[in-house]
Amino acid sequence: MASSNPPPQPAIGDQLVPGVPGPSSEAEDDPGEAFEFDDSDDEEDTSAALGVPSLAPERDTDPPLIHLDSIPVTDPDPAAAPPGTGVPAWVSNGDAADAAFSGARHSSWKRKSSRRIDRFTFPALEEDVIYDDVPCESPDAHQPGAERNLLYEDAHRAGAPRQAEDLGWSSSEFESYSEDSGEEAKPEVEVEPAKHRVSFQPKLSPDLTRLKERYARTKRDILALRVGGRDMQELKHKYDCKMTQLMKAAKSGTKDGLEKTRMAVMRKVSFLHRKDVLGDSEEEDMGLLEVSVSDIKPPAPELGPMPEGLSPQQVVRRHILGSIVQSEGSYVESLKRILQDYRNPLMEMEPKALSARKCQVVFFRVKEILHCHSMFQIALSSRVAEWDSTEKIGDLFVASFSKSMVLDVYSDYVNNFTSAMSIIKKACLTKPAFLEFLKRRQVCSPDRVTLYGLMVKPIQRFPQFILLLQDMLKNTPRGHPDRLSLQLALTELETLAEKLNEQKRLADQVAEIQQLTKSVSDRSSLNKLLTSGQRQLLLCETLTETVYGDRGQLIKSKERRVFLLNDMLVCANINFKPANHRGQLEISSLVPLGPKYVVKWNTALPQVQVVEVGQDGGTYDKDNVLIQHSGAKKASASGQAQNKVYLGPPRLFQELQDLQKDLAVVEQITLLISTLHGTYQNLNMTVAQDWCLALQRLMRVKEEEIHSANKCRLRLLLPGKPDKSGRPISFMVVFITPNPLSKISWVNRLHLAKIGLREENQPGWLCPDEDKKSKAPFWCPILACCIPAFSSRALSLQLGALVHSPVNCPLLGFSAVSTSLPQGYLWVGGGQEGAGGQVEIFSLNRPSPRTVKSFPLAAPVLCMEYIPELEEEAESRDESPTVADPSATVHPTICLGLQDGSILLYSSVDTGTQCLVSCRSPGLQPVLCLRHSPFHLLAGLQDGTLAAYPRTSGGVLWDLESPPVCLTVGPGPVRTLLSLEDAVWASCGPRVTVLEATTLQPQQSFEAHQDEAVSVTHMVKAGSGVWMAFSSGTSIRLFHTETLEHLQEINIATRTTFLLPGQKHLCVTSLLICQGLLWVGTDQGVIVLLPVPRLEGIPKITGKGMVSLNGHCGPVAFLAVATSILAPDILRSDQEEAEGPRAEEDKPDGQAHEPMPDSHVGRELTRKKGILLQYRLRSTAHLPGPLLSMREPAPADGAALEHSEEDGSIYEMADDPDIWVRSRPCARDAHRKEICSVAIISGGQGYRNFGSALGSSGRQAPCGETDSTLLIWQVPLML
């Protein structure tokens, strides 16, 4: 691969030695390139350690230093270079990466000596010159001039003889050096070396001894020249410095680096850099090649004049395209500003305000991101030029951002962002020149955006693209040639954003565990647990620990870092020194000498209990436990002094009880006053009633205070050491969370982490990778319980269907909402052939489901459908709460389809199980499936008929008494129905018929499977696609909802091979899509989980998925979802409630609160949910020094610009017009987020743990192998 750089020239400012002739023609035939090192203020002088005072070039008559005797042989790759180009037959990607992405300045020089001239010629040196006399091994005199500066040269030409002296240059010359000598300080980001470094050996190798001898000989030659003057002294000093760097590189280099050094000298490749520069090893492994972008700017993308006669959607699409062009142009300019205004000046600055090594860390991968978007901008320019004729943009996004290189460079940048901000923050305090440089650049910038504001833009680029493509897709009509490509582009960007989120989470998890491990002694048991590799960080946050006195007064509070691991809870102090008397942090605290954290306590997770205010009695045994509050001096017996010790909110609870007692006394006084015969001042019924009303108002205020205090107060009961008598002592620790959302997250994760420690969840899921050791991610569903489906086991009833009826229970406490299953009731239907059917109703308003009602039916239940309340009726009811005719109100209902053709409607509000209305299907055909749409209740029958019951007004939603509208779909049974926005899909055999939603007129049909004997059994929709399962075969297929095109096919058997070895015949029996996960149930009882996109793009599967180790002994009869929405008022903190409408008025334009979503569950389930890239920047907020911000702070007294408060959310960039404002910081946005509690229920015969098949001990099944069983998985709250 030829170098794109021009031939190296002497740098400006360097001068040749007076009286020394220039390079001759023969010297130019030997273009030996120098090896480069970046200048750094962290370099140390190691020449004394080596005993080498100075070094100068040698004469050409001396024997060569390097002998090529052990060159590694590499198999040639004919694809690496086309024939006839003169490029070597094989190329090292790692070398190319080093050459292309090195952060140091590139410079080189040529030897200016000649064998015909018998005098010494001193070369023109630049600062970065290291190797000054590297001979070119076997130069090709006939090589054309275009190939002289090749980055790589053939070490062994094909068919060329190998001489004896060319067969060896062993790396043993450098094995006598250690990394410890002269090594500079460790970088901010710890990068593990690729290989172990060699040990220190003081004995020099023969080649280095020969090097020292030649060094002394050459020095004598220099002195003999008698060329004095200032220029000669400067050149000698530069030469000595560069040779010092060379010797230091030889001493501190790893074996891997020395091998590359040897190859570099042999090939004359200028890629050698210090091993500790961040990014070298990563770039070698990635194999990224630098894209040469011409300095000549291509024409900027610009839309031409708008043609006449455009439709409104075309006009909007042009405006959105203009926003894409403007946003991309601004983004590319921001990336260029980072390099031109900050990185390049910092690298060239003398003296350096920031070392080259730190510059590499701060600006890591910015150049590569710029290359990606420069190419995208060029393609965008050509697409904009032909917009009026094509109107296509989606395929450009797919082609540009589906490459793995884009994911790699953005992953490196995002994972390095926190470290870069840490370096900048520390440098602002330790180096005034650097802070002055940042201020000066900000003042000179046209928009006065800080470096932080520029560097945060790559993090939020893909959320901006997603928003723009969503708007473009909304304004692209069906049938447009750009619609499918836009949906595919939206899927690519969403998948890319999800991968970046997951990689960022894993990187933060590893970094936090490493920091925690450093704070623990090497001999402690906690250190062994943390370093075992079995610990997974579930949640980590900075909370405020509070300590109260005997009367409930706040004694002290301090910030703690709390770590929730998969099996333990750790609390640590943040190890930063306090401020001085001026209120400023000491400079010595910026670089901590010790660990970042100091562990205060840690405890096993099963022993941690969450205690809510007013619910202490049911949490622990007060008679056998002593309560010692954290920070208290003495432990007080809970049964004796607990009534006198009030802990914050419990004090409010006690005051509420006192008010209730006072109100009872005042009511008695009121009764006594009413018996008075005389009239007395201030002692009459009016005053007594005022007393009662005042006490009632105080009670309401106290209840609100308790409720508000409980929202952000996390009370944990921790085990302590027993006292002298052996009685256990428990410690109460109180943490204040930043917002109610944070507390919900802690309570939920603590609860699920405890469940995850059960035997059936160790492990609960397996990723079928090659090593079979991949850990399931933290968001993985956890098996919460396994219960019998029917209370009566006398008859072996078969499962038919299950639905969830959501009902909000106001009696549940704050933590109960976070830990319990989705509120509501489970309706489970089934039966037995010839023995009738049965319906079982379970209540989910408790930690474990319990049966509340069971009733028999005349025939087995084959299908069920939950029909929520209509949206418009719910809105009218919310506007006018008083209804004249309560019987006219339509409540949510449960519709049942039986084997004898009966269709029954039950009210889901109460559990009285009174049948509202019933009817019989045409011909008494068994009802195989039920679906509701805004216009009809649809029933698929056994004979291929589709029965549609229209909507009515009144207390019953559907007119089941009148004859239904019947439509023949096909000769076979209608097995499944799917209701879309404007269409209904009905399957019959291998074909699917698409019906118009209102008139049910057939629009078109297509063949989903080529085998006529196969039937479509399940259809689920996600985004713009429909996944289908079939009656036989191991595959599921994806079809487009608009073009009906077959997009993807997935073989489920490949995911279950290691669980069921030798099982060839596998069939999919159930499908479910929920929260970006596709659940697949099989006839062998195995459940497979596949990730799918959540947005309105194409829901294609890109990941490998997971397989559950918990399943059924028989086929998975159904998969159902239970979902409930947490009430929005639960998420409002007391401060937000106190602000009220005043806070809305105080917000600037564009930052007002969004309208509060309606809390009705039925409508929330149908509402589309979007995701965005959610990189959290909170990990830099705890660092000392000025906080970073992209905003221009308000100048105080004409002072220079300072850094203001750091933004808490990456989307809050309202000062920049090119940034799309999507949401606000976490603390203020908490009460507007929808918190969904989700559980997945599978039904089948018995319970089976597949862990025994992998060699682990199988768990004893709670039910028989033939009993109908429900498995309930609880999904972590999506916060």
UniProtKB/Swiss-Prot annotation:
Q: One Pfam annotation, family name?
A: PH_19
Using the record's annotations, give every residue carrying the modification Phosphoserine: S40, S281
What keywords sit in the KW lines? Answer: Cytoplasm, Guanine-nucleotide releasing factor, Phosphoprotein
Cite the CDD domains for this sequence. Answer: RhoGEF
Locate the region Disordered. Answer: 1-91, 159-197, 1135-1163, 1186-1208
Among SUPFAM superfamilies, the record links this protein to: DBL homology domain (DH-domain) (SSF48065), PH domain-like (SSF50729), WD40 repeat-like (SSF50978)
InterPro entries per UniProt = ARHGEF10/ARHGEF17, DBL_dom_sf, DH_dom, PH-like_dom_sf, WD40/YVTN_repeat-like_dom_sf, WD40_repeat_dom_sf
One GO term describing the cellular component: cytosol
Substituting A96V results in: In a colorectal cancer sample; somatic mutation
Gene3D superfamilies linked to this entry: Dbl homology (DH) domain, Pleckstrin-homology domain (PH domain)/Phosphotyrosine-binding domain (PTB), YVTN repeat-like/Quinoprotein amine dehydrogenase
Instruction: Spell out the molecular function terms from Gene Ontology.
Output: GTPase activator activity; guanyl-nucleotide exchange factor activity
Q: Where does the record place Pro residues bias?
A: 1-10
Instruction: Look up the record and give one Gene Ontology term from the biological process aspect.
Output: positive regulation of stress fiber assembly
Its job: Acts as a guanine nucleotide exchange factor (GEF) for RHOA, RHOB and RHOC.
State the name under which the record lists this protein.
Answer: Rho guanine nucleotide exchange factor 10-like protein
Give the species this sequence originates from.
Homo sapiens (Human)
